[in-house]
Amino acid sequence: MNMRLTMKMTYLLGILAGTLLALPGAAPAQDLAKEALSGFPTQTIRLEFSTPAKLRGLPNYGTLRQRYIGPRLRKLVDELGQLGIREEDISGLVLGWQPGSAEMGLYGFATGRFSAQAITESAAQRNMTPTPVAGKPAYCLEAGLAGTCVVVLQDSLGAFGSLTTLTSMLEAREGQIPSLSSDSRFPSLVAGANKDAPIWGVAVGPAVADWFRGWMPNQGNLKLDWGKVFADVNSLTYSVAAGDDVTLGLKMDCKSAESAASLRQVLEGLKLVQQMAWDSQNPGKPNPYRTMDVGLESSQVSLKLTTGYSELELASGAAGMVN
C-alpha cells in the first residue's frame, strides 16, 4: 500500500474502529503491538500500525480526507454513523493482512475511548442483533461472513474484521490456537521498527511484493513481475513520517548480499522510470522521485523518499481513486 492509500485506509479504519470508542484510557502503542502479536492468526503476512491522533494534526489532513473517500468508503461511513461513531475518539490502530486479502478485507485492533454499553444500546435501537464470537457479542455492519463486524474486548480496546477472522483472532488471543508471536520473524521486525512514526508496518513473503505493487503503480511501458522482483526479500519494514513534508522510509532484508545488490539495481531503474512518468504527467511540478535514495548494506536494501503534500495529491490524482 502506498502513502496515499495508507492515509486513506488509516482514515477509513479509524472510523471503523471508532465504532468501539467513547471512555478515556487508551492503551499505549507498545500494548497495541503486543495485542497484534498475541491476537493475530499465524496466516497474517503484514501488520500496519498507525496513530490517528497524529495523522489528524497533519497539514491539509481535511483536504486529504475528503479526496480519498470513494463510494464504497462513504457507504461504510454512513453505516457506522448510524451507531453514533466519532472518528476523533480513536487513538491507535493495528491492521492485519492475510494472503489474498484486499483493502476492504482487513482486520485489526483499535484503542481509544469507548463504551460497550453505549454501543449495545445504539445497536438495539436499530434492531442490530449481536452475533456470538468466541463467547463475546459481535455487531456486524454488513450481512454475510465477509461483512465487517466489531467486538468490544475491554475498556479502550476493540477488534474488527469478518466473523471468520474475528473468531481466529479471539481464539489466538485466548491461547486456543497459535498466534503471530509464535512466528519469530514478527516479534523481531516489530521490535526494530520506527515506532515514533504515525504510520509504520512490517511485511513478509508475498506481502512485500503486494506493498510495492501499490506503491509504484505506474512503470510506464515497463512491465514487471513484482513477485519475481522481490522473490529473494525475506521481510520489509516501513514507516511514514509526517511534518512539513511526508517521508517514506523502508528497509528490506534479502536472502543474500548478492540478491540485495541485484534488487538495488532494479530499484534504481524504477526510480528513473518513475521520474520520467512523473515529468510526463506533471510537467513543471517538483519531482519527488529525484530525491529518492536507494541504499545498500550487506544483505539489506534501504529506500527513502520525501515529498510535499501537494505532490502527494498530484500522485493520488494520477493513480485514480480506489472505491
Predicted regions, residues:
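Bacterial N-terminal signal peptides that target proteins for export
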Residues: 2-14
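Bacterial N-terminal signal peptides
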Residues: 13-22
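Structural boundary/hinge residues at secondary-structure and domain interfaces
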Residues: 29-146, 187-228, 265-295, 300-302, ...
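Solvent-exposed, non-transmembrane alpha-helical starts
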Residues: 120, 168-170, 260-261
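A conserved glycine-rich beta-strand in the N-terminal activation segment of trypsin-fold
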Residues: 148-212
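Structural motif
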Residues: 153-154, 242, 297
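Hydrophobic lipid-interacting interfaces of membrane-associated proteins
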Residues: 162-164, 255-257, 299-301, 308
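A contiguous, surface-oriented mixed alpha/beta subdomain in the mid-to-C-terminal portion of proteins
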Residues: 206-264
